[in-house]
From Swiss-Prot:
A GO CC annotation given for this chain: extracellular region
Family as reported in the entry's similarity comment: Belongs to the conotoxin M superfamily.
Predominant place of localization: secreted
Domain notes: The cysteine framework is III (CC-C-C-CC).
Organism per entry: Conus regius
Subcellular location: Secreted
Keyword Secreted among record annotations: yes
4-hydroxyproline, modified sites: 11
Superkingdom as given in the UniProt entry: Eukaryota
Protein name as catalogued: Conotoxin Reg12e
GO molecular function (one): toxin activity
Keyword Disulfide bond assigned: yes
Length: 16
C-alpha cells in the first residue's frame, strides 16, 4: 500500500 511506503503522498498519509 502507498501509505506503507517510506515516501507517501497519499491523502491518508498527508491528511489530518
Amino acid at each position: 500500500k502507498c501509505c506503507m511506503r517510506p515516501i507517501c503522498t497519499c491523502p491518508c498519509c498527508i491528511g489530518p
